[in-house]
Amino acid sequence: MLPDPNGCLTAAGAFSSDERAAVYRAIETRRDVRDEFLPEPLSEELIARLLGAAHQAPSVGFMQPWNFVLVRQDETREKVWQAFQRANDEAAEMFSGERQAKYRSLKLEGIRKAPLSICVTCDRTRGGAVVLGRTHNPQMDLYSTVCAVQNLWLAARAEGVGVGWVSIFHESEIKAILGIPDHVEIVAWLCLGFVDRLYQEPELAAKGWRQRLPLEDLVFEEGWGVR
């Protein structure tokens, strides 16, 4: 056992088989929910647990650059939905033919249907001008915030809460709606609500948009392209 002169360490080891299975189940059955939300509101205690899980995420230099803007009012969500709809129409025009038709068939109603939305942001000034671990890779604060999103998503799966990540919008429009400062970046708009059914595989795979790549095609040994 490693020495611990400051008394800061605690015993560590593998989880029990049931605990491991629960962790992997959450990972493997997590889905991006687009339209299957139930109207039942989430309790404040549940929301606090999910945000607590997000706040436990690792961050570069312990920067903790995230903030969470909770959005529940219909008026605000409708403004965001209109911003999404404008961007979604623009996105549809970037595809053509059968691909465009399939894109337009994909429903994304979470902004309106989910009882809670969370705008997850990254304050790139937090921690000062020089942040440990970010000196040569300044984008690490954004990656850290994405870790918080993943933590929340997995915790939500364990709680029976669906999460949908909306990324089709002009950031400037959402910032204006929510009064987000210029130096803060939006990382994710998350729609949250209870679900009683989930797709057995990712929805985009189930609907023929794209399939999961074989893992063995993505793993290299000691260098790019080396297998």
Curated annotation (Swiss-Prot):
Query: Which reaction is the catalytic activity of this chain?
Result: FMNH2 + O2 = dialurate + 5,6-dimethylbenzimidazole + D-erythrose 4-phosphate + H(+)
Q: Which UniProt keywords apply?
A: Cobalamin biosynthesis, Flavoprotein, FMN, NAD, NADP, Nucleotide-binding, Oxidoreductase
List the molecular function annotations (GO) for this entry: 5,6-dimethylbenzimidazole synthase activity; nucleotide binding; oxidoreductase activity, acting on paired donors, with incorporation or reduction of molecular oxygen
Question: What SUPFAM superfamilies does the annotation carry?
Answer: FMN-dependent nitroreductase-like
Its domain of life? Bacteria
Consequence of gene disruption? Cells lacking this gene are unable to grow in minimal media and fails to establish a symbiosis with alfalfa, and these defects can be rescued by the addition of vitamin B12 (cyanocobalamin) or the lower ligand of cobalamin, 5,6-dimethylbenzimidazole (DMB).
The record's Pfam families line, in alphabetical order, gives: Nitroreductase
EC numbers listed for it are 1.13.11.79
| Gene Ontology biological-process annotations | cobalamin biosynthetic process
Activity regulation comment: Inhibited by high concentrations of FMN.
Which InterPro entries does the entry link to?
BluB (IPR012825), Nitroreductase (IPR029479), Nitroreductase-like (IPR000415), Nitroreductase/BluB (IPR050627)
Q: Where are the transmembrane segments?
A: none
Coiled-coil region(s): none
Q: Which of this chain's residues are annotated to bind FMN?
A: 30-34, 59, 108, 167
Q: What class of enzyme is it?
A: oxidoreductase
Family, as annotated:
Belongs to the BluB family.
Q: What does this protein do?
A: Involved in the biosynthesis of cobalamin (vitamin B12). Catalyzes the oxidative fragmentation and contraction of the isoalloxazine heterocycle and the cleavage of the ribityl tail of FMN(2) to form 5,6-dimethylbenzimidazole (DMB) and D-erythrose 4-phosphate (E4P). NAD(P)H is only required initially to reduce FMN and oxygen drives the oxidative fragmentation.
Q: How does it assemble?
A: Homooctamer.
What is the designated name of this protein? 5,6-dimethylbenzimidazole synthase
**Which gene is the coding source of this polypeptide chain?**
bluB
